Amino acid sequence: MATVFSRALGALVLGVACALLAGCASVRPANDLFAGTQDGDATITRYQGRFSARYVQDDAQQSAVGSFLWRERGADVQLELMSPLGQTLAIVSQNRQGATLELPNQPPRRAAEVDTLMQDALGFSLPVSGLRDWLRARPTPGTPARVARDAQSRPETIEQNGWTVHYVAWSDDGDNSTANARVRRLDLDRPQGAGGAPGPLSVRLVLDQ
């Protein structure tokens, strides 16, 4: 399973997903948590943008780039990773019943929660659970966190659960108050060995909307 996702990440970098994933395979969610909803649905929190990642695989530094779509409503969250050509290469979903990971040409994988599922299936874990709060510029409740703030009381960094979240840029919408500040870019770093992680992982997220 880790090999399949590694090929998907390679496709993000090289733009040759068709060659690596047999016939331009693209994931279609087996159980779409947001089927039938509209983009403007006010009950859904939606983030869309670009990502880049640096990680270590087989003692070699690797990198990947692509786009993402994050949708959230209540306990339901779905993260879709896409190649630069727009192919959906991985879908991570979580609701009250548990978590699901879907990859091209593979049956869905399920577990109690996202982080464990990704670690077991892929060999590393993106902090999907933490991102629910970090995208809102706040630490995840229930676990210790160290927060450094800027002159406007917005977070500069959040250190939590083995990750350091750097708030690099904010949307220039004329409202710089802490309550209404919107994240434009955040960088996430996890050192080797943090939380039992086998290797370092760095992720950059740029939010377009």
UniProtKB/Swiss-Prot annotation:
Annotated GO biological process: lipoprotein localization to outer membrane; protein transport
Pfam families given in the database record: LolB
TM region positions: none
GO cellular component terms given for this protein: cell outer membrane
Compartmental location: Cell outer membrane
Lipidation (S-diacylglycerol cysteine): C18
Bilayer topology annotation: Lipid-anchor
Lipid linkage positions (N-palmitoyl cysteine): C18
Keywords: Cell outer membrane, Chaperone, Lipoprotein, Membrane, Palmitate, Protein transport, Signal, Transport
Signal peptide start-end: 1-17
InterPro entries documented for this protein: LolA/LolB/LppX, OM_lipoprot_LolB
Assembly: Monomer.
Function: Plays a critical role in the incorporation of lipoproteins in the outer membrane after they are released by the LolA protein.
NCBIfam families (UniProt xref): lolB
Family: Belongs to the LolB family.
UniProt protein name: Outer-membrane lipoprotein LolB
